[in-house]
Amino acid sequence: MSENALRLIASYVEEAAAARARFFTDHAELVDAAARTMAVALARGGKILFCGNGGSAADAQHLAAEFVNRFELERPPLPALALTTDSSALTAIGNDYGFDRVFAKQVQALAGPSDVVVGISTSGNSPNVLAALRAARDKGCVTVGLAGRNGAIVPLCDYALLVPSDRTAHIQEVHATIGHLLCKLVDHYLFEAVMELGPYLEDH
């Protein structure tokens, strides 16, 4: 391996680790609060809906699968779906109303006030994700956003999980870790530490 290749690897890994460390140093409590709210929603019979574009669409499908199947804990399936998978709905809505509405109309059709809608956008400005979160708010859903440093997504979210990086790849990598921790913490609250969730069920 060349010295240049080694330097590229070392630099990339160092930057990625720094972005991850900065995020979790500053936002661990916010991740926990979002996960706890998701657990409350599921305990009350709600579901989790995910949306995003490109790599974030893959994240949406990945996380929905972790809830429906399982993450690490052997437990019952949890209701979750990615709004990125129904090609007929996506193309019908896109054709008739435009790409900006492909998630929002699904939220209007499928979401209820006991649900949580998670929008994933590395820029924080994806129009169709923003529209989905607006629709979710109109339906009375809790909204969670995964994004980069900022963006129009922030005021639309009850929980805005913002990664302090300008590199899309590093933002996506931290989003994957956040997603796994949301799964792990939801499992913890629903199946390992049920008593910890009790007061929040009473408060909501």
From Swiss-Prot:
Catalytic activity: 2 D-sedoheptulose 7-phosphate = D-glycero-alpha-D-manno-heptose 7-phosphate + D-glycero-beta-D-manno-heptose 7-phosphate
Residue numbers binding substrate: N53, G54, G55, E66, N95, D96, S121, T122, S123, S126, Q172
Cellular component aspect of the GO annotation: cytoplasm
Binding, Zn(2+): H62, E66, Q172, H180
Keyword list, A-Z: Carbohydrate metabolism, Cytoplasm, Isomerase, Metal-binding, Zinc
One annotated GO biological process: carbohydrate metabolic process
HAMAP family reported for this sequence: GmhA (MF_00067)
Subunit structure: Homotetramer.
Name of this chain's protein: Phosphoheptose isomerase
Highest classification ranks of the organism: Bacteria, Pseudomonadati, Thermodesulfobacteriota, Desulfovibrionia, Desulfovibrionales
Gene that encodes it: gmhA
